[in-house]
């Protein structure tokens, strides 16, 4: 009886401890603050998975507690001998089917969300996506706008409400491009182009970062994503085209060398003299000097 009372006293303290723990969270986690359709779909998947697993954990602990209390050894059943059994068909079917059902319940929405993230969000299929090439290097990010014929370093401007088709690649070690409030991460790799679709629902500033350790300058691989209204975005593009310097090959070679740089803006892009689909893009300087 005393054991039972002690257990329920400890159990009653659990909600209070959780409240105290959550009280230390003074702002929203970026992953749990979706600001676009891709991030919202992934957020819904996280919530569904969390609720399902929480339900499973709760059922397991309740059953464990009930069995522990109900069937514990007592003075009146010291001589109890359990019946000899060689199996229970019903129980074996249940504990085989339950895990299968759990896996199916998790797999179906996960597969649907994963495949949906590989194309333009369904809410914006009628809108032409803006194409941006993302190149990771040690230790900076290069963003090339082929249609606008401009390029930025360590910051990114996009139109709000318009899907963005990112073309991810690398001129250094493998990295991971991640804007938590807009969607999940995807790797950037030498000699490969990976597509990633993201979209910001409204104007705002969102932090992007590297999610894959790439050496001593890894902590500096953060960038700002600013979503602008269509009018402000078009105005920014025109200003860059008219006022920013050209990105020459020499300047590009200097930028991609290992090191930390600040924000840069150019009125041309390196895609005009480097083909990201070719093997040479893996290590542009190496192949250029080899020739």
Swiss-Prot record:
Catalytic reaction(s) noted: 2 a quinol + O2 = 2 a quinone + 2 H2O
Residue ranges of coiled coil: none
Gene3D superfamilies (alphabetical): 1.10.287.90, Cupredoxins - blue copper proteins
Transmembrane segments: 49-69, 91-111
KW Transferase (keyword) present: no
Signal peptide start-end: 1-28
Principal localisation: membrane
InterPro entries: CcO_II, CcO_II-like_C, Cupredoxin, CuRO_UO_II, Cyt_c_oxidase_su2_TM_dom, Cyt_c_oxidase_su2_TM_sf, Cyt_o_ubiquinol_oxidase_su2, QoxA
Compartments where located: Cell membrane
GO molecular function: copper ion binding; cytochrome bo3 ubiquinol oxidase activity; cytochrome-c oxidase activity; oxidoreductase activity, acting on diphenols and related substances as donors, oxygen as acceptor
EC class: oxidoreductase
Keyword terms: Cell membrane, Electron transport, Membrane, Oxidoreductase, Respiratory chain, Signal, Transmembrane, Transmembrane helix, Transport
Family indicated by similarity: Belongs to the cytochrome c oxidase subunit 2 family.
Stated role: Catalyzes quinol oxidation with the concomitant reduction of oxygen to water. Subunit II transfers the electrons from a quinol to the binuclear center of the catalytic subunit I.
Protein's recorded name: Quinol oxidase subunit 2
Gene, per the UniProt record: qoxA
